[in-house]
């Protein structure tokens, strides 16, 4: 068979881009060689609709083993009673929970997207906002932190069936205990999407939502540093509160509803090659050095946040508890949009993403902020001293975003710096 040089040349271009640049997108990371090897394995050839021991195809006895290992490692990692490793993505995991818990038109409550939430938590352009009645809570304008009092007010008024916590651009830890109290007051289930901080939670550096949430979802990439995919967890399994029964008349456990929601509810065959890669990543996360890595992610984020603040930038909420920070550019550069900032920084081989900030006057296509994070740069072996250097380079570009000479000079420095750092240093 003829080698597809067109595609493999493109793959090599992307490899060089990753190798030469500084990756600061908070949702990105670099996986180990063994995670990539598992993803590129012959397991991709196997169809395996169903779950271990209960498949709709023959010949699944081997992939049953790898999927079972993934489940058991994941449960150990987060101290969970039950886990599903089949969702193809975090959004699919969230959609499965909604499918299990809500009926079309039912009300749920999630964090406003422009305040740090996620598309799959009720955006009108997402299925979650089309199929269900989405209501929202915000962060406080003065502190940039989640307004739990407002969350409670909205919950008491709207009586949601589900309350959703977690977000895509929120740099503080969450008060899961308070959220569970609010959920209990209105008879709602509490779902936490821990996609962004999952690795830090696994390492014991942030609060574990499984102590309070009825259901927890996550991606397996980002801070968790696995392949792209999703998971669903239960700290403790429980009988579904709506009295749904099995054909034998027994009340179904929530785990049964969630399993059915993933397959056959919203997915068909699972990606067993990706599930094997998830198992590898979960195994890595159970090793002692993983905690050291996550502590460095957090330390690097704190150092970067301080460097930005010292340079006169405003960080929403005033700092970070996790791996990320949302920077409001208007304080230092009132006329600079996130779109222009992102383009200029990418040209300098520093990858970030434009992001709306709370109470933003600009659209999602322009934005007044950028989001940055430290998981990927930490995977490459960077430590606190480099964070200050990176912020200095970012500041140089943002002060002259249209100057090709400045951008070229910064790009040369970036490429020189990153020669000293392998893609995966752990």
UniProtKB/Swiss-Prot annotation:
GO molecular function, one term: pyridoxal phosphate binding
GO biological process: glycine biosynthetic process from serine; tetrahydrofolate interconversion
Pathway: One-carbon metabolism; tetrahydrofolate interconversion; Amino-acid biosynthesis; glycine biosynthesis; glycine from L-serine: step 1/1
Positions of post-translational N6-(pyridoxal phosphate)lysine modification: 222
Pfam families assigned: SHMT
GO cellular component: cytosol
Plays an important role in substrate specificity (site feature) positions: 221
Keywords: Amino-acid biosynthesis, Cytoplasm, One-carbon metabolism, Pyridoxal phosphate, Transferase
InterPro entries per UniProt: PyrdxlP-dep_Trfase, PyrdxlP-dep_Trfase_major, PyrdxlP-dep_Trfase_small, Ser_HO-MeTrfase, Ser_HO-MeTrfase-like, Ser_HO-MeTrfase_PLP_BS, SHMT-like_dom
Enzyme class: transferase
Listed NCBIfam families: PRK00011.1 (NF000586)
Record family assignment: Belongs to the SHMT family.
Subunit structure: Homodimer.
Name assigned to this protein: Serine hydroxymethyltransferase
Source taxonomy: Bacteria, Pseudomonadati, Bacteroidota, Bacteroidia, Bacteroidales
């Amino acid at each position: 068979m003829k080698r597809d040089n067109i595609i493999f040349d493109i793959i090599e271009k992307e490899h060089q881009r990753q190798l030469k640049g500084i990756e600061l997108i908070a949702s990105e990371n670099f996986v180990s060689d063994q995670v990539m090897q598992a993803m590129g394995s012959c397991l991709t050839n196997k169809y395996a609709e169903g779950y271990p021991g209960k498949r709709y195809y023959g010949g699944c006895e081997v992939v049953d083993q790898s999927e079972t290992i993934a489940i058991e490692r994941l449960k150990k990692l987060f101290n969970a009673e039950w886990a599903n490793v089949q969702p193809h993505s975090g959004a699919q995991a969230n959609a499965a929970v909604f499918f299990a818990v809500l009926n079309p038109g039912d009300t749920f409550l999630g964090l406003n997207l422009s305040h740090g939430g996620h598309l799959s938590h009720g955006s009108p352009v997402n299925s979650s906002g089309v199929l269900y009645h989405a209501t929202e809570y915000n962060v406080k304008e003065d502190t940039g932190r989640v307004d739990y009092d407002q969350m409670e007010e909205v919950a008491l008024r709207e009586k949601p069936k589900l309350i959703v916590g977690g977000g895509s651009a929120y740099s503080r830890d969450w008060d899961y205990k308070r959220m569970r109290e609010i959920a209990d007051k209105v008879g709602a289930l509490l779902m936490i999407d821990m996609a962004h901080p999952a690795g830090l939670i696994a390492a014991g550096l942030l609060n574990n939502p499984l102590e309070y949430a009825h259901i927890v979802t996550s991606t397996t990439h980002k801070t968790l540093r696995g392949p792209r995919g999703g998971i669903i967890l239960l700290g403790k399994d429980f009988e579904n509160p709506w009295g749904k029964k099995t054909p034998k008349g027994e009340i179904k456990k929530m785990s049964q509803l969630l399993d059915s929601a993933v397959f056959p509810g919203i997915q068909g065959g699972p990606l067993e090659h990706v599930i094997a890669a998830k198992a590898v990543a979960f195994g890595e996360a159970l090793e002692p050095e993983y905690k050291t890595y996550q502590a460095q992610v957090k330390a690097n984020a704190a150092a970067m946040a301080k460097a930005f603040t010292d340079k006169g930038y405003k960080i929403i909420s005033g700092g970070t508890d996790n791996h990320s920070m949302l920077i409001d550019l208007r304080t230092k550069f009132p006329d600079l949009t996130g779109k222009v900032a992102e383009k200029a920084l990418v040209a300098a081989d520093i990858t970030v993403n434009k992001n709306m900030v709370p109470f933003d006057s600009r659209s999602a296509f322009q934005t007044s902020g950028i989001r940055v994070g430290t998981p990927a740069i930490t995977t490459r072996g960077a430590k606190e001293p480099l964070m200050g250097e990176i912020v200095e380079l970012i500041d140089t570009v943002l002060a002259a975003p249209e100057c090709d000479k400045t951008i070229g000079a910064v790009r040369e420095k970036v490429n020189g710096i990153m020669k000293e750092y392998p893609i995966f240093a752990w």
